[in-house]
Amino acid sequence: MELKGKRVLVVGLGESGLAMAKWLHRQGALVRVADSRDNPPNIDALQRVAPGAELVAGAFAEATFAGADFVALSPGVPKATPEIAALEIPLISEIELFADGVREQVPNSQIIAITGSNGKTTTTALTAHLLNGAGVPAIACGNISPSALDALMDAQDAGALPQVWVVELSSFQLETTHHLNAAAATVLNVSEDHLDRYEGSLANYAAAKSRVFQGKGVMVLNRDDDWSMANGRCGRKMVTFGLNAAPRGVDYGYADGAIWRGKDKLVAIDALKLSGLHNAANAMAALALCEAIGVDPLRLIEPLKGFSGLPHRVETVAEIGGVLYVDDSKGTNVGATLAAIEGMGRKVAIVLGGDGKGQDFSPLKPALEKHGRAVALIGRDAAAIGMALEGSGVPTRILGDMEAAVLWLAAQAQAGDCVLLSPACASLDMYRNYAHRAQAFIDAVEGLKS
């Protein structure tokens, strides 16, 4: 893609928008940045990284887009925004710029692309960890942060370009990505999330995810997820993983408490620091992705054993009186919370609630009928979740804040149980972000010790 002299409008001045402006400036493009906020973030940083870039802040107008050759759209700005939808010029993403930059400037490196409703950040971090542990230089970037273009520019500046880019991708990033051409890619799973952006359609959301398979690379598919498996295509190499026996010698599976490749046992899951069957699935996906680019899975087992996971993703906080307290604040949708409930292997007393993003909470009911000890509901959609759980037989109470929720659940829990924060909701109705929510949970658990 020839960028020199092109007039490019970057829409949105968050992390991704700033990275696009910086990259485009470096490539000799004429950069204008538009943000619908009157006082967007990163104004000073924009002038440092893209001197001379024009900034248009405030409500979009026809003049905002005048003269642009194409628009580089930040993932937080929907394509359906009326002023964007009316455009007749190309829309591209940061990831499109990144993939093009890698092809043109780092042609000897490969891209591994990872998306899914749940587990994509852990799988991205784990895949990069496995590759580096096996002596294959890799950088994790994208939705996981740093942004893909920031990672590329930083590696160029440091003269330390990796062999592999492991890129976490959201559906938002994929909407305007057209030529990703990853060497290997996966859709880990698809469950209800962000449906407010996709007209309430799970099929539209899944279609955005499936764009990760652009090109001819190896497809890594989840046998336990119909949406993932639906991406299978004739003429493409496909490897599957799932929480059952591997059907073919090239596939990954779970049986007898261990991860297998075909009929070869690789590692017992109790030898891993990662906990939960959902993380066994993430590990299988990571192994398959690494093998897809030519790394022998036997070289990956020791690094796999050493990976302890990421903060706020099924992370043990404490054990008090025989009860485990686990922070899964990153469980922001129903699918993630189901995975946590079913993967704990014990009864759960759970904190649910927040901004439900229009999800259907009814799938939680059978899981809690089987695994639930008690349910504490907080936040904006507490009542809606409570209605979805009616008749479950599990004690349920709406409470005013995290401290009250943890205190009540601690009183309901029995030795051997888990008090689990996995809210199935976004956090912004009560907290700055999911990490702030996690800290409230951790503080409440600490209060139990005193």
UniProtKB/Swiss-Prot annotation:
Its function, per the record, reads: Cell wall formation. Catalyzes the addition of glutamate to the nucleotide precursor UDP-N-acetylmuramoyl-L-alanine (UMA).
Q: Which GO terms describe its biological process?
A: cell division; cell wall organization; peptidoglycan biosynthetic process; regulation of cell shape
Q: Which GO terms describe its cellular component?
A: cytoplasm
The similarity comment for this entry is: Belongs to the MurCDEF family.
Tell me where on the tree of life, at the top rank, the source sits. Bacteria
Q: Which UniProt key words apply to this protein?
A: ATP-binding, Cell cycle, Cell division, Cell shape, Cell wall biogenesis/degradation, Cytoplasm, Ligase, Nucleotide-binding, Peptidoglycan synthesis
Cite the InterPro entries for this sequence.
Mur-like_cat_sf, Mur_ligase_C, Mur_ligase_C_dom_sf, Mur_ligase_cen, MurD
Please write the reaction equations for the catalytic activity of this protein: UDP-N-acetyl-alpha-D-muramoyl-L-alanine + D-glutamate + ATP = UDP-N-acetyl-alpha-D-muramoyl-L-alanyl-D-glutamate + ADP + phosphate + H(+)
Tell me the compartments it is located in.
Cytoplasm
Residues annotated as binding ATP are G116, S117, N118, G119, K120, T121, T122
What main location does UniProt list?
cytoplasm
Its EC number(s): 6.3.2.9
Q: Pathway involvement?
A: Cell wall biogenesis; peptidoglycan biosynthesis
Q: Which organism is it from?
A: Dechloromonas aromatica (strain RCB)
Q: What GO MF annotations does this protein's record show?
A: ATP binding; UDP-N-acetylmuramoylalanine-D-glutamate ligase activity
- Any matching Pfam family: Mur_ligase_M
Q: What is this protein called?
A: UDP-N-acetylmuramoylalanine--D-glutamate ligase
